[in-house]
Amino acid sequence: MKLRIFSSSRQIREYYNQKKQQNALLDSAIHIGEFLDKVCLSNFHKASSYESLLLMQEACLKSKDLEKKLGISVEFFAFLKNNEYLFSFFKELSLEKKSIEDLKNNDYYATYNEHLEILDEVYKNYLALLEKNSFYDDLSLPKNYTLNKDFLDEYEAIVYDLQGFLSKFEENLLSEISQIKEVVLSFKTSKFNLEYLLKLDFLKIFDLKINTHYEINLSKQEILKEEIFKTKNSKMKLKSFELRALQCAFVMDEISHFVRKGLKPENIAVITPDESFCEFLRLFDKDNMLNFASGISIKESLFYQKFQALYESASSASFIYKNQEDYFEDTQM
């Protein structure tokens, strides 16, 4: 049995929907995040989001100039709101196998050397605190891990359906796994990603062509599939409206048009400029046709609106509180 790795849950659902009609044993399919958790082992315990947050705050407290020079407050509630900037920056460095020293050597960041030195201190403090407390997380794992060979031995091959781009860590990991297990990389080329793909170490030897679907065995360095596909000559309709209400009406009309043309409703996607536009769409979606991927904020729920109205009424100066201990007895009568 093969293990198939996908970049999104939607791809996994599509894979099972396509294969469920076949009377055969299906390959296992998992998300890339789950695969990384299973295939990379550490001698430490994985830090929870709360533990990581507290350790990052402690690392920041050890850096005296962080708040003064970078304006990042280490006061807990302010830090709770802004810590994501630090985590995302350090995670990007970790996944791309880069150090802050590499950035300092780049002319583009020359004017920010003092800021980078402060961030470097915070980063080193954080990694040291993780190790001191026997923790690891997404920032430290790429620097120190071992392959879970028992997990890999459960499958005859690993097939990764690449959608998008690989981080340097993922690229190195696939190369490492390909030395002990058959690894197949499946991807499609286009004018947007061909140059990037040709720079990957394990694809440099291949003469990749544009608009082609490839399946390449990284272990044997051979092409298993090379299939040219035709790009769709898509026609775009561009409209502009001054009012959001008119934009919503246009969206609903286009959805109806697509359905009448025979397009399956589940294959229609509405991409919004921001989440606020979804609020307008909900008002126009009287028949509940739309499934909002972002979910519904609790502030928009009927329960919250009623509770908010009660709270505002109770907070009003004209609110009169009457203690009626026998209320339930009166209602039963």
PLM segments and residue spans:
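Conserved short internal alpha-helix adjacent to the catalytic or cofactor-binding core
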Residues: 1-78, 194-333
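Basic/charged alpha-beta structural segments of nucleotide/phosphate-handling enzymes
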Residues: 9-153
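Conserved helicase NTPase motor core
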Residues: 107-204, 240
